[in-house]
Amino acid sequence: IAGPIFLPATTMALTFAEFDHTLRDGRVVHVREMRPEDEGEFVQTFDRLSPDARYMRFMRFVKAPDMKRLREVLGSLHEHGFGLVATVPAADGYDIVGSAIYFLGKDPSVCEFATTVDGDFAGAGLGRLVMTTLIAEAKKRGVAVMEGFVLSENKPMLRLAARLGFAIASDPDDRSVSYCT
């Protein structure tokens, strides 16, 4: 999706095929579509993120999850975008250790992405997995252009975006932010 790739929009209902994937370090994650009932697990995921990881993800310091916004996002994905999670088994059922999401803009052929990876899974290939899966799903659903805003100091995400084919430029209005498209 990097760059201006124009695909025909699709109007057919699409389903996401869940799958298991073995990461570079041997751990196995289960990848599936986000669901509204993931709310509690997203709160736990947020709580496990370091303050620096939260800053890199939300582009500002955030002490607690915005529950209203979380419910809005989880409740509107089928109409306005798509999200996926990577999970591992946990004592309470499962933990979300990675996620990627896109939301469509006014032009339904353009979307904005965001991704999060649990710090314990950094460097294992999980970020690449959730992003490549998100990109493939966006293409399948007729998205032509994917874009994202990343803090310029978030070098791991910028390296990943570059390896995935995104063009990266500084935001002319805010040099602390890089624009990936």
Regions found by a protein language model. Name each.
Residues 6-181:
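Long, contiguous binding/interaction regions
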